[in-house]
């Protein structure tokens, strides 16, 4: 520690600028608080793209900014989040640009309930992955249990509340306490032994109960050994640990979770008044069913008595029924015979129509008809095609360039054979070919003005 930091920094003789003040304050802070541990709760957690981690560490009365640079952040195993209680180690420094002091951290560890909460989440995830929380493993509670084992502390309000509920709702149920510690170093082992003992006693159901407390107080119910002992129980088990807001690993593994020990007792203690009403309802239903059964038996007996008194009537009824069956059978046989006869006639008719001789005669008749129609069709087709050809030849002659030339016109062609359409395409002295309706002439351009062109014949 520095005994006289002001004398060391020369603050008694020198007037400093703000930058100098912040710089010397940073040196002083880093020298005095170079390696310290601080405990608090994370808030305002930020993770920029640089990989550094920034957050505020606070308690009920104050807060301080913290910086965890990338190389140190990579060594932190637990996931940091707002609300997590942690212990941090680092040095106090000053951000000179703003004059804010902050902690430059090299280590972050969970603290208090924060460490327990991380362990809780890790075990919960592990057991869930193994299927210990699945609905298929849950055993339904008995509707009317007679013997119930209670695993809890022999002292305190929990056992008194459970007994009070059973005395009020189901005094006939036999309760057996398997005493165990529910807090402290020995609690886990004692709870595991109590669960094994209770499961071997053949109870109808078990209650695992404890009153409220902090996460640390209830921690034995979050131990893996207790969770696996609960899962191994064949007897249906209700977990009632802590208050309604408390949740333990044993709650997830048990067959049923009750928010409080009293609620667990109510789940397993059927209301006596309800049972009485249920018995009365069953009695009324039984009486009604017995009356209905007696009535049906009486009617049946009367019917049997009537049949015994008149056997002749029964024989007459049977004879009449036999005659009716005989008539129905004869009519059915006749219908079948007529149906088969009609089908045979239809088949014979179809067979005659398919006879080869008849088919051959039909084909020969059709062939003669086609042979007679073929010459006429060919002559008519040729006549139509000849008329079409003559019409097309006349149309072609009308639009033919030769027909135009025959009327006194000519076509002028240059030496490359291109048609001359106006005087601008020619020049004086150019030799051209004039194609007439009959024959050709060689001509020479004498004048190529837009006035009519003067041509002269070549010798």
From Swiss-Prot:
GO CC annotations on file: cytoplasm; exodeoxyribonuclease VII complex
InterPro entries: Exonuc_VII_L (IPR003753), Exonuc_VII_lsu_C (IPR020579), OB-fold_nuc-bd_dom (IPR025824)
Enzyme class: hydrolase
UniProt keywords, alphabetically: Cytoplasm, Exonuclease, Hydrolase, Nuclease
GO molecular function terms attached to this record: exodeoxyribonuclease VII activity; nucleic acid binding
UniProt subcellular location: Cytoplasm
Family (UniProt): Belongs to the XseA family.
Its job: Bidirectionally degrades single-stranded DNA into large acid-insoluble oligonucleotides, which are then degraded further into small acid-soluble oligonucleotides.
Protein name (Swiss-Prot/TrEMBL): Exodeoxyribonuclease 7 large subunit
Organism: Pseudomonas fluorescens (strain Pf0-1)
Gene: xseA
């Amino acid at each position: 520690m520095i005994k006289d930091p002001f004398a060391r920094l020369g603050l008694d003789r020198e007037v400093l600028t703000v930058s100098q003040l912040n710089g010397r304050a940073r040196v002083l802070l880093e020298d005095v608080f170079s390696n310290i541990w601080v405990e608090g709760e994370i808030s305002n957690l930020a993770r920029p793209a640089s990989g550094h981690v920034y957050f505020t560490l606070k308690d009920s009365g104050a807060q301080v900014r913290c910086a965890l640079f990338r190389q140190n952040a990579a060594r932190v195993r637990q996931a940091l989040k707002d609300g997590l209680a942690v212990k941090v180690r680092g040095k106090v420094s000053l951000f000179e640009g703003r004059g804010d002091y902050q902690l430059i951290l090299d280590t972050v560890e969970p603290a208090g309930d924060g460490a327990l909460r991380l362990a809780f989440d890790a075990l919960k995830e592990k057991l869930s992955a193994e299927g210990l929380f699945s609905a298929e493993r849950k055993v339904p509670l008995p509707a009317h249990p007679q013997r119930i084992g209670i695993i809890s502390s022999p002292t305190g309000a929990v056992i008194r509340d459970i007994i009070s509920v059973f005395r009020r709702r189901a005094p006939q149920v036999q309760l057996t306490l398997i005493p165990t510690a529910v807090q402290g170093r020995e609690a886990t082992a004692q709870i595991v032994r109590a669960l094994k003992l209770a499961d071997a006693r053949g109870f109808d159901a078990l209650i695992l109960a404890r009153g409220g407390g902090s996460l640390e107080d209830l921690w034995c119910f979050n131990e893996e050994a207790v969770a696996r002992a609960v899962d191994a129980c064949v007897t249906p088990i209700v977990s009632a640990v802590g208050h309604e807001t408390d949740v333990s690993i044993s709650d997830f593994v048990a067959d049923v979770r009750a928010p409080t020990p009293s609620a667990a007792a109510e789940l397993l203690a059927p209301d006596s008044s309800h049972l009485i009403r249920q018995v009365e309802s069953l009695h009324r239903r039984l009486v009604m069913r017995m009356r209905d059964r007696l009535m049906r038996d009486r009617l049946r007996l009367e019917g049997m008595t009537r049949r015994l008194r008149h056997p002749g009537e029964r024989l007459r009824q049977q004879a009449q029924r036999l005659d009716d069956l005989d008539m129905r059978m004869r009519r059915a046989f006749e219908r079948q015979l007529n149906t088969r006869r009609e089908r045979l006639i239809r088949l014979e008719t179809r067979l005659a129509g398919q006879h080869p001789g008849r088919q051959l005669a039909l084909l020969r008749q059709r062939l003669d008809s086609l042979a007679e129609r073929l010459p006429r069709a060919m002559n008519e087709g040729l006549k139509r095609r000849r008329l079409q050809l003559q019409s097309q030849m006349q149309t072609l002659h009308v639009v033919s360039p030769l027909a135009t030339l025959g009327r006194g016109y000519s076509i002028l062609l240059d030496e490359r054979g291109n048609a001359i359409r106006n005087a601008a395409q020619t020049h004086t002295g150019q030799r051209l070919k004039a194609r007439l309706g009959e024959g050709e002439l060689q001509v020479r351009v004498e004048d190529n003005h837009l006035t009519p062109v003067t041509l002269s014949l070549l010798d």
